[in-house]
Design a protein with these regions (language model features):
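Transmembrane alpha-helices and adjacent helix-loop boundaries
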Residues: 1-431
Length: 431
């Protein structure tokens, strides 16, 4: 049946098929994401009647699905009819006005992102918090892989270092080294992650390509084995983990809810994104790009490969250490099984899907690969199937990623031109 409907949509004119497709997507979103939509509608006196119209206690009503289909189809139809006029009117505006309008939309989006969790409830706050942690780690790995070209499959080790140092410095348990506040423990955790990142990079300085992936994978596993070992158990608690880690507090107000911790993660992500953006445009960022493209040429140009690589590992680890620090206070406890290899793979996957070297791509990749599976927990067993399909689809349809950087777009375009020129040359030779 679905195949017949799909074939029918393809045969219909675009002006008809697009509203129908949009309506179906709108109705599907209303049903699949009801855990997100229902609390927002039900918690307000103004929107409560709309909630009762669309939903019942067991889910989306039939009339709700029809209403969502018609409303979404109408919006798509209206947009298709008016888009040329809107684009023409926008094009007639002077560049200054266009820039102000764009910044107005960006400001509105930021305000919605800030205010949305307050009304969405703790479940959505927890999902956004998880996405935020992966955004932080994604920005760190993006420095290593996307900009410097250093494939790191042991990245989760830095995440673990940040979490464990925070736990050891804050926990109210026999394993605590001190009883610091979060604001005292967090910078120390980040610094320790940087140190471990630099030490991590020393053995793999001369390793390239696939061998680098295997080497970093092994080093990451070494950290996990050390945490689980009997020798480190008196300090790190082994498999029992570190318990009773208190929540951070600001002026006597404890950040105890997922929404409050999300705002902490949001602030950390904004600061980290600014730092990463400035790094990318700096002399160090250009040196990273040079060694990514060709290490031998970069060295011939006078770039110190050792210093530049170690800085990439150390600064990338700082982002993971910050995420690990927040993760420790989010759970209130730390266990070794929380830091598995699959986390490194997830971070690498979201960078590939979002776009190598792109900060907005990291956010989009985390939203798609981390946020959507969290929202659709009834399909949780298919999470890794979804990851695989998403990566294959991106590689086939948008090899540069969903939101690539300008440099990556240029590289893809140049590669395509080179391949086309080579194909034309071969055709001429055969002729």
């Amino acid at each position: 049946v679905l195949g017949c409907l799909g074939a029918l949509l393809v045969m219909l004119p675009r002006r008809i098929s697009r509203p129908l497709t949009g309506g179906a997507i709108g109705a599907g979103i209303a049903g699949l994401f009801q855990e997100l939509i229902r609390p927002i509608l039900a918690n307000s006196v103004v929107t409560k009647p709309l909630h009762d119209l669309l939903y019942t206690w067991s889910g989306l009503k039939l009339q709700g699905a029809v209403i969502m289909f018609l409303v979404t189809a109408g919006i798509v139809l209206a947009w298709d009819m008016n888009r040329p006029r809107v684009a023409a009117a926008f094009g007639r505006l002077d560049p200054g006005t266009q820039r102000r309008i764009r910044w107005g939309y960006i400001t509105l989006a930021v305000l919605l992102a800030v205010l949305f969790p307050m009304y969405a409830g703790n479940f959505i706050g927890q999902v956004l918090l998880t996405v935020g942690l992966f955004v932080l780690m994604g920005m760190g790995l993006n420095l290593e892989v996307g900009i410097a070209g250093l494939l790191d499959l042991g990245f989760v080790a830095f995440y673990a270092v940040g979490a464990y140092v925070t736990g050891l410095l804050m926990a109210d348990s026999p394993f605590a080294l001190a009883h610091l506040s979060y604001w005292q423990a967090m910078p120390i955790a980040v610094l320790c992650s940087v140190i471990v990142g630099v030490l991590f990079g020393v053995p793999v300085l001369k390793v390239r390509g696939d061998y680098l992936a295997v080497a970093t994978l092994g080093l990451g596993e070494i950290v996990r084995v050390i945490v689980l070992s009997d020798a480190a158990a008196p300090l790190l608690a082994g498999a029992k983990g570190i318990l009773q880690i208190p929540r951070p507090a600001i002026g006597g107000f404890e950040l105890a809810t997922p929404v409050a911790l999300f705002y902490l993660t949001l602030v950390a992500s904004v600061v980290a994104a600014y730092f990463a953006w400035r790094l990318e445009d700096s002399r160090l960022g250009r040196a990273w790009m040079a060694i990514r493209d060709d290490e031998d040429v970069a060295q011939a140009l006078g770039i110190n490969l050792i210093n530049v690589k170690l800085l990439a590992y150390g600064l990338g680890a700082a982002f993971a250490g910050l995420a690990g620090s927040i993760f420790a206070v989010m759970l209130g406890s730390i266990y070794p099984h929380s830091f598995q290899l699959i986390i490194s793979i997830n971070i690498l996957a979201l960078i590939i899907v979002g776009g190598m070297g792109s900060l907005p791509g990291v956010v989009l990749g985390a939203a798609v690969l981390i946020g959507l599976p969290e929202m659709l927990r009834e399909f949780g067993e298919f999470r890794y199937l979804f990851y695989g399909l998403a990566i294959i689809a991106v590689m086939r349809l948008k090899p540069e990623g969903l939101w690539p950087s300008a440099a990556r777009r240029r590289e893809i375009a140049l590669d395509a031109e080179t391949v086309a020129a080579q194909a034309a040359s071969v055709s001429e030779q055969k002729a």
